[in-house]
């Protein structure tokens, strides 16, 4: 149930939703707490790497495998 790039995402869940192609949920923040215009967007490589690491740590039902790193660490 990944969301296509440009698709609407839930700002309450912010980065915790799965967006296709290493995307993440980006919102406009109004007055620091109201979020609007939330869409799945493609970030730079550095942005999505950081967001994916945060997502893996913070999101309750996160699936870090959805963060397709270009340099995946080798499994031992």
From Swiss-Prot:
Subcellular location: Secreted
Name of the protein in its database record: Omega-agatoxin-Aa3a
InterPro entries given in the database record: Omega-agatoxin_II/III_CS, Toxin_34
An example molecular function term from Gene Ontology annotations: toxin activity
Function text: Omega-agatoxin are antagonist of voltage-gated calcium channels. They block insect neuromuscular transmission presynaptically. Potent blocker of N- (Cav2.2/CACNA1B) and L-type (Cav1/CACNA1) calcium channels.
Listed Pfam families: Toxin_34
Record keywords, A-Z: Calcium channel impairing toxin, Disulfide bond, Ion channel impairing toxin, Knottin, Neurotoxin, Presynaptic neurotoxin, Secreted, Toxin, Voltage-gated calcium channel impairing toxin
Origin species: Agelenopsis aperta
Tissue: Expressed by the venom gland.
Disulfide cross-links: 2-19, 9-25, 16-52, 18-40, 27-38, 59-67
Acetylation as UniProt keyword: no
Keyword field contains Secreted: yes
Entry comment, domain topic: The presence of a 'disulfide through disulfide knot' structurally defines this protein as a knottin.
Main location: secreted
One cellular component term from this protein's GO annotations in UniProt: host cell presynaptic membrane
Similarity comment: family membership: Belongs to the neurotoxin 04 (omega-agtx) family. 03 (type II/III omega-agtx) subfamily.
């Amino acid at each position: 149930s990944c969301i296509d790039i440009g698709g609407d995402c839930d700002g309450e869940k912010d980065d915790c939703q799965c967006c296709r192609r290493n995307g993440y949920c980006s919102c406009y923040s109004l007055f620091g707490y109201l979020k609007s215009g939330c869409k799945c967007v493609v970030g730079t490589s550095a942005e999505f790497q950081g967001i994916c690491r945060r997502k893996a740590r913070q999101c309750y039902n996160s699936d870090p495998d959805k963060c397709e790193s270009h340099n995946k660490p080798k499994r031992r």
